[in-house]
UniProtKB/Swiss-Prot annotation:
One of its GO terms (cellular component) is cytosolic large ribosomal subunit. GO terms for biological process: translation. Disulfide bonds: none annotated. NCBIfam families: PRK01242.1 (NF002316). Keywords: Ribonucleoprotein, Ribosomal protein. InterPro entries: Ribosomal_eL39 (IPR000077), Ribosomal_eL39_CS (IPR020083), Ribosomal_eL39_dom_sf (IPR023626). It comes from Methanosarcina acetivorans (strain ATCC 35395 / DSM 2834 / JCM 12185 / C2A). One of its GO terms (molecular function) is structural constituent of ribosome. Belongs to the eukaryotic ribosomal protein eL39 family. This is Large ribosomal subunit protein eL39.
Amino acid sequence: MSHNMKGQKKRLAKAHKQNTRVPVWVIVKTNRKVVSHPRRRHWRRRSLDVK
């Protein structure tokens, strides 16, 4: 990670932040119609297209 460019690190950080679960209040508000996150990514199963 030490030789990465700042832009790439920034994009990796954004991907890291986006990779979170659906908030509990959303699940409660939608009466459990929304429980899964379609863009959720597992580090071993799906790779990132970071340039």
